[in-house]
């Protein structure tokens, strides 16, 4: 039996944060993704995973939501100065570049002057933190894709 109902289109966000030692900070950032400005839970937003690497002092928070909720990325860049958002996959229209293609294009694993890069949303990357620039002691890089 097949269903004619179209499933929910999802988007995922890989939020890279330059913090791993203070677990409560990473958890608070993850909780912030789940709540609206009134403290109520967004019904279609989930934190799928939190990975913290003590050696590299960074954490990656994987967030999934309905494609309809992608305005959250725009809200985030307004409320977190220095946040850069790079889109890939179905979110990267019209090119639809994969994460690997975007990282190569951005020189993600090479030393380069990131100040010339323009993110899809948010501030240009800073020299201090590279692609994950922020003025608040945290460094953020967001990648959005649809699946």
From Swiss-Prot:
The keyword Endoplasmic reticulum does not apply. Widely expressed with highest levels in liver and skeletal muscle, and moderate levels in kidney, bone and pancreas. The keyword Methyltransferase does not apply. Keywords: Signal. Residues 1-20 form the signal peptide. InterPro entries: Formiminotransferase_N, Formiminotransferase_N_sf, FormiminoTrfase_cat_dom_sf, FTCD. GO terms for cellular component: intracellular membrane-bounded organelle. Pfam families: FTCD_N (PF07837). GO terms for molecular function: folic acid binding; transferase activity. It comes from the Eukaryota. Belongs to the formiminotransferase family. This is Formiminotransferase N-terminal subdomain-containing protein. It comes from Homo sapiens. The lineage of its organism: Eukaryota, Metazoa, Chordata, Craniata, Vertebrata.
């Amino acid at each position: 039996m097949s269903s004619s109902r179209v499933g929910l289109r999802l988007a995922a966000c890989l939020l890279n944060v330059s913090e791993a030692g203070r677990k409560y900070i990473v958890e608070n950032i993850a909780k912030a993704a789940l709540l609206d400005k009134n403290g109520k839970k967004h019904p279609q937003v989930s934190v799928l995973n939190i990975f913290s690497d003590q050696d590299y002092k960074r954490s990656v928070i994987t967030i999934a939501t309905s494609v309809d909720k992608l305005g959250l990325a725009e809200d985030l860049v307004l409320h977190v100065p220095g946040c850069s958002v790079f889109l890939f996959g179905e979110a990267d229209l019209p090119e639809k570049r994969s994460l690997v293609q975007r990282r190569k294009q951005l020189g993600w694993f090479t030393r380069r002057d990131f100040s010339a890069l323009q993110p899809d949303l948010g501030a240009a990357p800073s020299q201090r933190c590279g692609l994950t620039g922020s003025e608040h002691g945290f460094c953020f890089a967001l990648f959005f894709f649809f699946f």
